[in-house]
């Protein structure tokens, strides 16, 4: 299935080249830029070409080409690299048409705003383009070349622990193999939807794995197509179950690019949003997504000692438990568009026993924000229900709640009596009590609503 999607992506990319990135030449200044390649150049290439672009707060808007000559200070702009600072290494993945990735600048700028660091961007477009199976054959050689540079940097004062690799798709496995070459002594690796095709059944030695760095995290958003479905880090964030992201409906053909790659690239965009500090994006440990949605995993007590892991740059994703967990799956919900901030609202209902199955719609409203709609099915043999929903605002900013008895399609649905409905935000914090309404009676097609008066 994934191979079919890769072929479709290559075909559709021909139609949407402009959407893949800015292909304009670098300005007349001496700013370095990504390589671009064509099919003819790719066929004629005799060896893999890798180059490195350096960005720091001193040259945040004008990347410099970084080579081993830089380490000998034979180039004027080499003073930008500061071995006493941490170094973020960005590694892109598969490039279908040989174009530079359009997102690199945004990610680098977000990292520099957050911390005073060196940002090294690995440009291996020449080896990452066109035939995916051949690209996979190249990834270890790319990792070897990167490791040579890292080894040189350690001789000039950098430490292995100071390196944080951020790999997108196939770039996650490149980063992982660099970590393997350094026996897991790199400081951190972040895999943004690590590639799945040709890696799902691979040995841990040949893919990203928790042994590749002191701390490895991964964000999964397309595990049923381009991304890997298994946990590969100390902690693995599965956004919206790790597949079928909100706002990436496959039924729409308005954007062919979005149709093919939207889910896969959501990990990157959510990560960048987390760096921009829009809101805390925290995950809950759970055995599965359905169990999480059913409200069975509402704390982070085990194995995180009550501190939920958070996407971003906190040390070890905010995990304070020792030893670190391994391949721990955590789940979280997001909204359909940036900044993807979602507050996890636990909805608990107690219903008087029914004669027939029933269907209701629950709507949570916050002024100035999209509504949250939940469609719930109620059964004759159950009276208590729990579910988790994503809402764009915190609990204390929910202004009203509405219930609609939507009825059955092929039979007349009777009235429904709710003993109570409670909504609360998870993880629960001190001073944030649940909002509860008792003794609710709704007839078919007659909306019921309740307004909350709150001040955050």
UniProtKB/Swiss-Prot annotation:
S-S bonds: 248-262, 286-297, 300-308
EC number, as in UniProt: 3.1.1.-
Keywords: Disulfide bond, Glycoprotein, Hydrolase, Lipid degradation, Lipid metabolism, Secreted, Signal
One BP annotation, GO: lipid catabolic process
Domain of life according to the entry: Eukaryota
InterPro entries xrefs: AB_hydrolase_fold, Lipase, Lipase_LIPH, Lipase_N, TAG_lipase
Glycosylated position list: 35-36, 72, 82, 276, 305, 350
Principal cellular location given in the protein's record: secreted
Top enzyme category: hydrolase
UniProt GO MF annotations: phospholipase A1 activity
Subcellular location, record wording: Secreted
CC per GO annotation: extracellular space
KW Ribonucleoprotein (keyword) present: no
Catalysed reactions, as listed in the record: 1-(9Z-octadecenoyl)-sn-glycero-3-phospho-L-serine + H2O = sn-glycero-3-phospho-L-serine + (9Z)-octadecenoate + H(+); 1,2-di-(9Z)-octadecenoyl-sn-glycero-3-phospho-L-serine + H2O = 2-(9Z-octadecenoyl)-sn-glycero-3-phospho-L-serine + (9Z)-octadecenoate + H(+); 1-hexadecanoyl-2-(5Z,8Z,11Z,14Z-eicosatetraenoyl)-sn-glycero-3-phospho-L-serine + H2O = 2-(5Z,8Z,11Z,14Z)-eicosatetraenoyl-sn-glycero-3-phospho-L-serine + hexadecanoate + H(+)
Position of the signal peptide: 1-21
Pfam families xrefs: Lipase
Active-site residues, as the UniProt record annotates them: 169, 193, 264
Annotated family: Belongs to the AB hydrolase superfamily. Lipase family.
Function: Hydrolyzes the ester bond at the sn-1 position of glycerophospholipids and produces 2-acyl lysophospholipids. Hydrolyzes phosphatidylserine (PS) in the form of liposomes and 1-acyl-2 lysophosphatidylserine (lyso-PS), but not triolein, phosphatidylcholine (PC), phosphatidylethanolamine (PE), phosphatidic acid (PA) or phosphatidylinositol (PI).
The name this protein goes by in its record: Phospholipase A1 member A
